[in-house]
A protein has these predicted regions:
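Non-cytosolic coordination micro-motifs
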Residues: 1-9, 41-148
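N-terminal leader/targeting segments
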Residues: 1-36, 145-148
Length: 148
């Protein structure tokens, strides 16, 4: 079954969890809803209930990626309210590694921690998480349109 996300049928999500995964508890694939089913985003993530520990994981992975891609633009974002929570109680912190000069020019790697409010966790069944995300240019432009 395809899980269409973001209130439309442009993209769908497939989520896998397995005890055999070594690094991440789950992997999420986002694909365009076309004949080719091109992967537009690939994520690895872990569930966490400790935002401070999540930020430590984020810092560690971000250092590895910055060392791996020293010539790419890195944008460190401050901790902020998560745009998906209208109450403003959920928070997120992200580091973006851009494969171009701007967010809409090329693909991106995002290293992210999200601390959902108790209300969001109960209502939507979402969990606090740490994620490493690779987005295509197409999907990144789509996400930018949701945030504006």
């Amino acid at each position: 079954k395809m899980n269409f996300a973001y209130g439309g049928d442009e993209f769908f999500i497939i989520f896998y969890q397995s005890p055999t995964f070594l690094t991440y508890e789950g992997v999420q694939i986002t694909s365009g809803n076309s004949e080719n089913y091109t992967i537009q985003s690939l994520e690895g993530g872990n569930f966490t209930n400790n935002f401070d520990e999540c930020k430590k994981m984020k810092t560690s992975v971000e250092k590895e990626l910055v060392d791996l891609f020293p010539n790419l633009k890195v944008v460190y974002q401050e901790e902020r309210k998560h745009w998906s929570d209208p109450s403003g109680l959920s928070k997120t912190i992200t580091t973006n590694i851009l494969f171009g000069k701007t967010y809409d020019e090329a693909g991106i790697i995002r290293i992210n921690c999200t601390d959902w409010s108790e209300k969001i966790e109960k209502e939507k069944g979402w969990n606090d998480n740490f994620r490493v995300i690779m987005n295509s240019k197409i999907f990144n432009i789509f996400l930018l349109s949701l945030e504006s």
